[in-house]
UniProtKB/Swiss-Prot annotation:
This is Glycine cleavage system H protein. Keywords: Lipoyl. One of its GO terms (biological process) is glycine decarboxylation via glycine cleavage system. It comes from the Bacteria. Residues 19-100 form the Lipoyl-binding domain. SUPFAM superfamilies: Single hybrid motif (SSF51230). The keyword DNA-binding does not apply. It holds the Pfam family GCV_H.
Length: 126
């Protein structure tokens, strides 16, 4: 799996794009299986780095979504309310929320695509 080089990643398997969109990685959606429900915050909500901001429910489990950065939610991907399976189809295009960062330096704490790919492979036992 190729992870977009312009995204930053967390060890909890979330990504953030340069424009502040947040989603889960292909590795995460593959581990979860068929996603049937996504719970997201409302526009205007504040999220805090490392804290849960929603959840993803699959046929296997419910998993919390952890904020890679702190910020204010400026948009929510409403498509996922009716078609959560889009996360399985293309995890790196199916963003969940868009945020306005309150502390852009938090991006420096995140993993590059190459580092995340190595981390995900080690976690999977490869």
């Amino acid at each position: 799996m190729a992870y977009p080089a312009d995204f930053k990643y967390t060890k909890e398997h979330e990504w953030i794009s340069a424009d502040g969109k947040i989603g889960i990685t292909d590795h995460a959606q593959s581990s979860l299986g068929d996603i049937v429900f996504v719970e997201l915050p409302k526009v205007g909500a504040t999220i805090t780095k490392g804290q849960s901001f929603g959840s993803v429910e699959s046929v296997k489990a419910v998993s919390d979504l952890f904020a890679p950065v702190s910020g204010k939610v400026t948009a929510v991907n409403e498509e996922l309310a009716t078609t959560p399976e889009k996360v399985n189809t293309d995890a790196h295009a199916a963003w969940m929320v868009k945020v306005e960062l309150t502390n852009p330096s938090e991006l420096n704490d995140l993993l590059s695509a190459a580092d995340y790919e190595k981390f995900a492979a080690e976690e999977a036992g490869h």
